[in-house]
Curated annotation (Swiss-Prot):
This is Adipose-secreted signaling protein. Transmembrane segments: none annotated. GO terms for cellular component: extracellular space. It comes from Taeniopygia guttata (Zebra finch). Residues 20-30 have a biased composition (Polar residues). One of its GO terms (biological process) is positive regulation of non-canonical NF-kappaB signal transduction.
Length: 176
């Protein structure tokens, strides 16, 4: 078989940059680190309050089948008062460890298990001496195990990993 045209053209030259580099790009051979402006990257857990008085706590990226301790601060809620306690909510993935009253609000510490991929929202309820309660929704973006290790926000700490059953690593060889 003939390969017409193969090798008939000269090889093209590569792209060349001027010694000082192109605008916005470092010169070849220099370190190419990415730097973000401080105001563009907020590394703390974000707490927002909606018009109903409930809270949304965004804890950032987490890794699937890992357990995290999450600490965040809620602003003062006049309806609850100083003595706040968690209401029992049957949720195997999110449990409150402690709620501490502070002059500037309440410090909440909870344990969260990232049990599946995607944007997950888990709820917890806090109550005071009055008959009202507030709902706190913890939102996490959970990555699968093949997408690396996420940078955790301030207030989020990995405390362990759940064992994952992987059928390829099974010790059972079947019937002989």
């Amino acid at each position: 078989m003939a390969t017409a045209g193969k090798g008939s053209k000269g090889k093209g030259t590569g792209v060349r940059f001027t010694p000082e580099g192109t605008q916005g790009h470092p010169q070849e051979g220099t370190q190419g680190h990415v730097h973000f402006q401080e105001q563009l990257h907020d590394s703390a857990v974000m707490v927002t309050q909606d018009k109903d008085g409930h809270f949304l706590v965004k804890v950032g990226f987490l890794k699937i089948l890992h357990k995290y301790e999450i600490t965040f601060q809620l602003p003062p809620v006049p309806n609850l008062g100083k003595d706040v306690c968690p209401l029992p909510v049957p949720n195997p993935n999110l449990r409150i460890i402690s709620v501490t009253s502070l002059p500037e609000g309440h410090n909440v510490r909870c344990e969260y298990t990232a049990h599946k991929e995607g944007v997950l929202k888990e709820e917890l309820l806090l109550a005071g001496h009055s008959p009202t309660h507030i709902k706190v929704t913890v939102q996490a973006r959970v990555m699968d195990r093949h997408h690396g290790t996420p940078m955790l926000l301030d207030g989020v700490r990995c405390v362990g990993a759940e064992l994952e059953y992987d059928s390829e690593q099974s010790d059972w060889h079947g019937f002989d």
